[in-house]
Amino acid sequence: METVRAPATSANLGSGFDVFGVALDRPADIVRVERADKTTIEVTGVGSQYIPEDPHSNVVGAVAEALDAPAQIQIDKGVRPSSGLGSSAASAAAAAVALNGLYDRGLSRTELVPIAAEGEAIVSGEAHVDNVAPALLGGFTIARNSTVTTVDTTIPLVACLPEIAVSTRDARRVVPDSITMEEAVHTVGSAATLTVGMCQSNPALVGAGMDEHVVTPARAELVTGYDTVREAALTAGATGVTVSGAGPAILAVCKAERRRAVAAAMIDAFETADVEARAYQTCVSAGATLF
């Protein structure tokens, strides 16, 4: 048997649509695998009632098929589905590491990224790596074509998750098909600023680099109370706020000593919009780990 914990992740970070991602130290999924003649899946934990156990419809089933590694697979969900915190990526990454070890495939973490992404395709319709890369490799990741660059960094974060659901497919439909040159220049500047901030573990630069005027406003429309929550977080000391992945989670960066205040402010702001929410006081962390 192999047991692996894989973390929640936040993709895009505002200016890095389909490129940037970070691993969070909490929440996380735990996946256990045992060899079998055919793949079976059992799902428990947060939102398990919404996750199919048919291997042909589950992300870990796709990973098992890609690795030619049939197994009895148990998934203990800690990352809620349709949260914007890389729920499917956490399961796919954990399964990839566990099955790679169980069958002694000898693949590196980097080589497992496209395999885990095949599982992501079941959820979003496309094999994106912006969540599975940090879930496997940890830290801050930059995905460009088939190359993934990883940066170890120490950045405090707050991930606030409201009790509403936004599907990845719906969130992709609202993304504009084209942008202006002015918007492109602004996004490139923000992305460069954020990258420098990650390399320097500088929350002020990371927060400034989250600013983006194309994808974020479109997806924010799907999150009830987004503008109010964003302003509350900034007032409480956040240096930057954006939609986490497809949403509805909202990610804030701040100094470590402001995390508690930022988390409380975001929860209170959602309450004024009649939305229940919880906040994870977290940070950029390691990727999938063997138990």
Curated annotation (Swiss-Prot):
Q: Name one GO biological process term.
A: threonine biosynthetic process
Localization of this protein: Cytoplasm
Q: In which pathway does it act?
A: Amino-acid biosynthesis; L-threonine biosynthesis; L-threonine from L-aspartate: step 4/5
Q: Which Gene Ontology cellular component terms are annotated?
A: cytoplasm
**Mind listing the UniProt keywords for this protein, alphabetically?**
Amino-acid biosynthesis, ATP-binding, Cytoplasm, Kinase, Nucleotide-binding, Threonine biosynthesis, Transferase
| Stored Pfam families | GHMP_kinases_C (PF08544), GHMP_kinases_N (PF00288)
Main localization of the protein described in the UniProt heading: cytoplasm
Does the keyword Nucleotide-binding belong to this entry? yes
Function text: Catalyzes the ATP-dependent phosphorylation of L-homoserine to L-homoserine phosphate.
What is the name of the protein in this document? Answer: Homoserine kinase
Species name for this entry?
A: Haloquadratum walsbyi (strain DSM 16790 / HBSQ001)
